[in-house]
Curated annotation (Swiss-Prot):
Residues 1-5, 52-60, 106-108 are periplasmic. It is found in: Cell inner membrane. Residues 27-30, 82-84 are cytoplasmic. The chain crosses the membrane at residues 6-26, 31-51, 61-81, 85-105. It is a multi-pass membrane protein. Belongs to the UPF0060 family. This is UPF0060 membrane protein YnfA. Its main location: membrane. It comes from the Bacteria. SUPFAM superfamilies: Multidrug resistance efflux transporter EmrE. The lineage of its organism: Bacteria, Pseudomonadati, Pseudomonadota, Gammaproteobacteria, Enterobacterales. GO terms for cellular component: plasma membrane. It comes from Escherichia coli (strain K12). Coiled coil: none annotated.
């Protein structure tokens, strides 16, 4: 389960970076060249999703819980926004959902 969770976090980071770089280009007039690493990051994101041994819908559902947590870490570290009790509570609930789904992978 730890390996799966770490893989999900790596996957989420690739997705967030792949979306953040075009956002910088569009919103902050950054270089159009940011689209190249963004595309690579998104391709890596898709490839990482294929490494899980479950049906794609289950992988996407479980991944969503980790994505929420990773996005909140990004909010804190990159955007510099302090997390609220609601952020922490939502992240905990999302992570619990992911753990429940992953725990059932070998039982179906």
């Amino acid at each position: 389960m730890i390996k799966t969770t770490l893989l999900f976090f790596a996957t989420a980071l690739c997705e967030i970076i792949g979306c953040f770089l075009p956002w910088l280009w569009l919103k902050r007039n950054a270089s159009i060249w940011l689209l190249l690493p963004a595309g690579i990051s998104l391709a890596l994101f898709v490839w990482l999703l294929t490494l899980h041994p479950a049906a794609s819908g289950r992988v996407y559902a479980a991944y969503g819980g980790v994505y929420v947590c990773t996005a909140l870490m990004w909010l804190r570290v990159v955007d510099g926004v302090k997390l609220t009790l609601y952020d922490w509570t939502g992240a905990l609930i999302a992570l619990c959902g992911m753990l429940i789904i992953v725990a059932g992978w070998g039982r179906t």
